[in-house]
């Protein structure tokens, strides 16, 4: 029985080789490894009637937009305009400061009125 060696993965051609018979049969563990590693040509038999490998899918438009800033703006600037249901910390501190200032003025006015009376 003649045996030929077939690479299990494109990255590890030097060390990992799977031996298969000329009939194209693999033992169950080799077939499982080929399926897990993504080498489908080891699992499927080559048939001249089947079409060749499909070209890679076109990358999505969304992925392209991430690489190229739209209108020359950076990503951080584009995030500033997004709506957030949560209050911005700076606005919350300003509100707290104004409320405390109003109460302090009211308390001072009440004390001044009481002292003068």
Curated annotation (Swiss-Prot):
Domain of life assignment: Eukaryota
Pfam families in UniProt: DUF4687
Annotated stretches, region: Disordered: 1-30, 43-87
Composition bias type Polar residues, residue spans: 1-12
PANTHER family found in the cross-reference section: GENE 5617-RELATED, SIMILAR TO HYPOTHETICAL PROTEIN FLJ20010
Protein name: Uncharacterized protein C11orf71 homolog
Phylogenetic lineage: Eukaryota, Metazoa, Chordata, Craniata, Vertebrata
């Amino acid at each position: 029985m003649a045996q030929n060696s077939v690479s299990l993965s494109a990255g590890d051609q030097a060390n990992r080789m799977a031996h298969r018979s000329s009939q194209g049969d693999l033992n169950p563990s080799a077939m499982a490894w080929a399926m897990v590693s993504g080498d489908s040509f080891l699992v499927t038999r080559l048939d001249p009637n089947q079409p060749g490998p499909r070209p890679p899918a076109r990358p999505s438009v969304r992925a392209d937009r991430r690489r190229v800033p739209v209108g020359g703006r950076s990503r951080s600037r584009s995030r500033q305009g997004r709506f957030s249901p949560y209050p911005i910390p700076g606005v919350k501190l300003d509100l707290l400061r104004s409320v405390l200032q109003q109460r302090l003025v009211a308390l001072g006015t009440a004390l001044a009125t009481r002292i003068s009376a």
